[in-house]
C-alpha cells in the first residue's frame, strides 16, 4: 500500500535552501540525533523539510505548538505530497473540563467534554496510516505526548476479513461490538454497522467517505465491496479488508478481566492506608466509585473515565510512561519540531500541571493512586522516545541550540528576494490615532494589517474603537475554536475585513502574504509578550509582503526591542546583498487561499453551531446578487424543500438558517420583479 514519497511542487530549491537541504540530509545520514534549522520568516522552511522527507523516504512526525499552525502545516504538506498519506493528529476536544477537586470549598468538578467527531476520525486515520504504510507525514500538536491505546493491543483487536473466509454472521457482529461499533439500522454513520439479511454494512471509524459491504453466503464471506455511504454507489470490490477499532482505547476481554483483578487488589491496599489514617469519608467514597466502575467494565467492557485505569489495561508497571503516538512511529522515523522555541517548553510543562490535579483527586479518595499513571510524557521520557530530530524556528531556544551544538543550519536568504520589514518606533501617547491613519492608508491599497496588544481588554476596546470609525476589523481570541480560527485567517486573506486584532495568537508561522503592516502596541513593556523572540516573530508576520513594515509603539527602546531591531536589520542587509549579487527584484508571494483543513461540511456545521464569539456570519448557500427573477424563484423553491427536510429531521438550527436566507431572497425577488 505504501508508495515512495513524491514531492509535488512547481519550484526548485533556491537561495539558502539547497545548502540547508544538503546539510540536514548529511546530518541525518551521519546519525546526528539533533539538528536545528534556523530559517527566517518566508524563507521556505516547510519546503526545505518536505525536500528532506522526499529525499530520505522516511515516515515523519511534525510537531506544531498549536492547532492553528498544525492545520496550516497539514494543508501545506498535503499540497507537497498529494499521493502520500498526510495525516492530522490533534486533540479531538472542542471543549474539555477535566475532573478536579477543590478542597477549600469541598467542590468536586465532574469531567465534561465535547468531542469533535471529524478530528477523532482524522486521529484514527493517522494511526492506521502509521501501522500500514511508510509514506506517512503526521502533523501533530502536543496531543502526541498524551496517553493513547497500546499499539500491540490495538493491532490484536483488528478484524481481518477476506473473500472466501469461513465465519458466521453472529461472530462478525460480536467482533464488531468488541471493537465498540454500534448497530444502527436507521442512521448509518461513522463507527456503526447495519444488518440486512446476509449483508452487513460497516462504516469504518477512521473513514469519512467510504464504507464496507460484507456479503455472506451461509457461513462464507462471498464478496467485500467499498461503497459511498451517502449514495450507496459501489466504488470497488476488494479481496480483503481490515476493520480497525472505533477508539484507540479498546482492550481484549481477557485483558479487561485481568485488569479488574489488579484494580481490586489496589483498592484493597488503598482502603487499608485510608482507614489507618482515619480517612473514613475518603475510604467510603473511593470504594463506592471504584466498585461502580468495576461493575460497568464487567458488563460493558468500558466505563466512564476508563483512562484512569490505563496502567492496568496496557499491562504497565507503576511509573512507566504511557503508550503515545510515538509508539506508533517506526524506529527509523523522523521528528520535526516546528517553532521549537514554543513547542519544546510546552512539552516540558504538560506533565506537572496534570500531576498537581491528580494528586488532589487521589488524596481525597476520588481516584486510586494508579490514576496518576494516566498522564502525558515527562520531558525526559519524550527525549528518550524521540527519534532523530530537526528543530525548526526563526528564533531557536537555548535548549535546541545546546542540543544541536554546531549543527545549526542557517536559512536566512529568501528565494523571492523579499526583505525583512522596515521597523519604526513611535510614541505611545498617540498610538491609537496614529494606528487608525496607518490602517486607512493600507485599506485604500487593499493590504491587510495585524495589530497585537498586551491584554484582552485592550484588544476588545481597540476593536470597538476601530469599528466605530468605520474600519472592517475582527478580533482573534482564545475562545474561538480551531476551525473558526482558520476561517478568520482565511477571511482576512480574502479581504472580507482589513484589520485583525490579537494578543498572543498572531505570531509563529502564520502565513499571510497580504499583511503589509504589523503594529505592536506598548512594545516597551518588557515581558514574555514583548521579549526579543516574541518581537522578532510578530515582526516576521509582515515579511511576506513587498511593502512590509512594522511599527513598534513605545516611549523608550528596551533591550528586547534593540535586539529584535538589530537582528531584523542584520537579516535585511544579508538579503539585500544577496539580491544585488544575483540581480533579484523582491516579489510578493501570490499564495492561493485554500480551506486548510478541507473539513467540507463540518466547517458549515461548526459555524452554525458556534457561539457567535467571532462575529462571523454563516453563509449557507451563496446567492448571486444579479440572479434573474426566474432563477431566484427556483432557488427559493429549492431552499423551501431543504428547510422542510431539516425541520422533519429535527435540525432546527439549520432550518432557521435557511429561513433567514429565504427572507432575504424573497426581498431580492420582489425588488427584481
From Swiss-Prot:
A Pfam cross-reference name: ResIII
SUPFAM superfamilies found in the cross-reference section: C-terminal UvrC-binding domain of UvrB, P-loop containing nucleoside triphosphate hydrolases
Any single GO molecular-function term of the entry would be: ATP binding
Q: Does the keyword Glycoprotein apply?
A: no
Protein localization? Cytoplasm
User: Which of UniProt's keywords are assigned here?
Assistant: ATP-binding, Cytoplasm, DNA damage, DNA excision, DNA repair, Excision nuclease, Helicase, Hydrolase, Nucleotide-binding, SOS response
Transmembrane region positions? none
Could you tell me which residue ranges the Helicase C-terminal domain spans?
431-597
Which InterPro entries does the record associate with it? Helicase/UvrB_N, Helicase_ATP-bd, Helicase_C-like, P-loop_NTPase, UVR_dom, UVR_dom_sf, UvrB, UvrB_inter
Provide the Gene Ontology terms for cellular component: cytoplasm; excinuclease repair complex
Q: Where is this motif: Beta-hairpin?
A: 92-115
Q: Which residues make up the binding site for ATP?
A: 39-46
Matching Gene3D superfamilies = 6.10.140.240, P-loop containing nucleotide triphosphate hydrolases, UVR domain
Q: Where is the Helicase ATP-binding domain?
A: 26-183
Functionally, this protein is described as follows: The UvrABC repair system catalyzes the recognition and processing of DNA lesions. A damage recognition complex composed of 2 UvrA and 2 UvrB subunits scans DNA for abnormalities. Upon binding of the UvrA(2)B(2) complex to a putative damaged site, the DNA wraps around one UvrB monomer. DNA wrap is dependent on ATP binding by UvrB and probably causes local melting of the DNA helix, facilitating insertion of UvrB beta-hairpin between the DNA strands. Then UvrB probes one DNA strand for the presence of a lesion.
Write out the domain note. The beta-hairpin motif is involved in DNA binding.
Q: How does it assemble?
A: Forms a heterotetramer with UvrA during the search for lesions. Interacts with UvrC in an incision complex.
Give the protein family. Belongs to the UvrB family.
Q: Which NCBIfam families match?
A: PRK05298.1, uvrb
Put simply, this protein is called: UvrABC system protein B
Originating organism: Salmonella heidelberg (strain SL476)
Gene name per UniProt? uvrB
Amino acid at each position: 500500500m505504501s508508495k515512495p514519497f513524491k514531492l509535488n511542487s512547481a519550484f526548485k530549491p533556491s537561495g539558502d535552501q539547497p545548502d540547508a537541504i544538503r546539510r540536514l540530509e548529511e546530518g541525518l545520514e551521519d546519525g546526528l540525533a539533533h539538528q536545528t534549522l534556523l530559517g527566517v520568516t518566508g524563507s521556505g522552511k516547510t519546503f526545505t523539510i518536505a525536500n528532506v522527507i522526499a529525499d530520505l523516504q522516511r515516515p515523519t512526525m511534525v510537531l506544531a505548538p498549536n492547532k492553528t499552525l498544525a492545520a496550516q502545516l497539514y494543508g501545506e504538506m498535503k499540497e507537497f505530497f498529494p499521493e502520500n498519506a498526510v495525516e492530522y493528529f490533534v486533540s479531538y476536544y472542542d471543549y474539555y473540563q477535566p475532573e478536579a477537586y477543590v478542597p477549600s470549598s469541598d467542590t468536586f468538578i465532574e469531567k465534561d467534554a465535547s468531542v469533535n467527531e471529524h478530528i477523532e476520525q482524522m486521529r484514527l486515520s493517522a494511526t492506521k496510516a502509521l501501522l500500514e504504510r511508510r509514506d506517512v507525514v503526521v502533523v501533530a500538536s502536543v496531543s502526541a505526548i498524551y496517553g493513547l491505546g497500546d499499539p500491540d493491543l490495538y493491532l490484536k483487536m483488528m478484524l481481518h476479513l477476506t473473500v472466501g473466509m469461513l465465519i458466521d454472521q453472529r461472530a462478525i457482529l460480536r467482533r464488531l461490538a468488541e471493537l465498540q461499533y454500534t448497530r444502527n439500522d436507521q442512521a448509518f454513520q461513522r463507527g456503526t454497522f447495519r444488518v440486512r439479511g446476509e449483508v452487513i454494512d460497516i462504516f469504518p471509524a477512521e473513514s469519512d467517505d467510504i464504507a464496507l459491504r460484507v456479503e455472506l453466503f451461509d457461513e462464507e464471506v462471498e464478496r467485500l465491496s467499498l461503497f459511498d455511504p451517502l449514495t450507496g454507489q459501489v466504488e470497488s470490490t476488494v479481496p480483503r479488508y481490515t476493520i480497525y477499532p472505533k477508539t484507540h482505547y479498546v482492550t481484549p476481554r481477557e485483558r479487561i478481566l485481568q485488569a479488574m483483578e489488579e484494580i481490586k487488589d489496589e483498592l484493597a491496599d488503598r482502603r487499608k492506608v485510608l482507614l489507618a489514617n482515619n480517612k473514613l469519608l475518603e475510604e467510603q467514597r473511593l470504594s463506592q466509585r471504584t466498585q461502580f466502575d468495576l461493575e460497568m467494565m464487567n458488563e460493558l467492557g468500558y466505563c466512564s473515565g476508563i483512562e484512569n485505569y490505563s496502567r492496568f489495561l496496557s499491562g504497565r508497571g507503576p511509573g512507566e510512561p504511557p503508550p503515545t503516538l510515538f509508539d506508533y512511529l517506526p524506529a527509523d522515523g523522523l521528528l520535526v519540531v516546528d517553532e521549537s522555541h514554543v513547542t519544546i517548553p510546552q512539552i516540558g510543562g504538560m506533565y506537572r500541571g496534570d500531576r498537581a490535579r491528580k494528586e488532589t483527586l487521589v488524596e481525597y479518595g476520588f481516584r486510586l493512586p494508579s490514576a496518576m499513571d494516566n498522564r502525558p510524557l515527562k520531558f525526559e521520557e519524550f527525549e528518550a522516545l524521540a527519534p532523530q530530530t530537526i528543530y525548526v524556528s526563526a528564533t531557536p531556544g537555548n535548549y535546541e541550540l545546546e542540543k544541536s551544538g554546531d549543527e545549526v543550519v542557517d536559512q536566512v536568504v529568501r528565494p523571492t528576494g523579499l526583505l525583512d520589514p522596515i521597523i519604526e518606533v513611535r510614541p505611545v501617547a498617540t498610538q491609537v490615532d496614529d494606528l487608525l491613519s496607518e490602517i486607512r492608508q493600507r485599506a485604500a491599497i487593499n493590504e491587510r494589517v495585524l495589530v497585537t496588544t498586551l491584554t484582552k481588554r485592550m484588544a476588545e476596546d481597540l476593536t470597538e474603537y476601530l469599528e466605530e470609525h468605520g474600519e472592517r476589523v475582527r478580533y482573534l481570541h482564545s475562545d474561538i475554536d480551531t476551525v473558526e480560527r482558520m476561517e478568520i485567517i482565511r477571511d482576512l486573506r480574502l479581504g472580507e475585513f482589513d484589520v485583525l486584532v490579537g494578543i498572543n495568537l498572531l505570531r509563529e508561522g502564520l502565513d499571510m502574504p497580504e499583511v503589509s503592516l504589523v503594529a505592536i502596541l506598548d512594545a516597551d513593556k518588557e515581558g514574555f509578550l514583548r521579549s526579543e523572540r516574541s518581537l522578532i516573530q510578530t515582526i516576521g508576520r509582515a515579511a511576506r509582503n513587498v511593502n512590509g513594515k512594522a511599527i513598534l509603539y513605545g516611549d523608550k527602546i528596551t533591550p528586547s526591542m534593540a535586539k529584535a531591531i538589530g537582528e531584523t536589520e542584520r537579516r535585511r542587509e544579508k538579503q539585500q546583498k544577496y539580491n544585488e549579487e544575483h540581480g533579484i527584484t523582491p516579489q510578493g508571494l501570490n499564495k492561493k487561499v485554500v480551506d486548510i483543513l478541507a473539513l467540507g461540511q463540518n466547517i458549515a456545521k461548526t459555524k452554525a453551531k458556534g457561539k457567535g464569539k467571532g462575529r462571523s456570519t454563516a453563509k449557507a448557500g451563496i446567492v448571486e446578487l444579479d440572479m434573474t427573477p426566474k432563477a431566484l424563484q427556483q432557488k427559493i423553491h429549492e431552499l423551501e424543500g431543504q428547510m422542510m427536510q431539516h425541520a422533519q429531521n429535527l435540525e432546527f438550527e439549520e432550518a432557521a438558517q435557511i429561513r433567514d436566507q429565504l427572507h432575504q431572497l424573497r426581498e431580492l425577488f420582489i425588488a427584481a420583479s
